C-alpha cells in the first residue's frame, strides 16, 4: 500500500491554501 503519493498531494494542496491565506 502506497499512501505517500496521496499525502504529497494533500501537502501540496495545503501549501496552496496556506499561500492563499498568507496573501490576506
UniProtKB/Swiss-Prot annotation:
Keywords: Secreted. It is found in: Secreted. One of its GO terms (cellular component) is extracellular region. It comes from the Eukaryota. Expressed by the skin glands. This is Skin secreted peptide 2.
Amino acid at each position: 500500500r502506497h499512501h505517500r503519493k496521496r499525502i504529497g498531494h494533500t501537502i501540496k494542496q495545503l501549501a496552496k491554501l496556506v499561500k492563499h491565506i498568507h496573501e490576506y
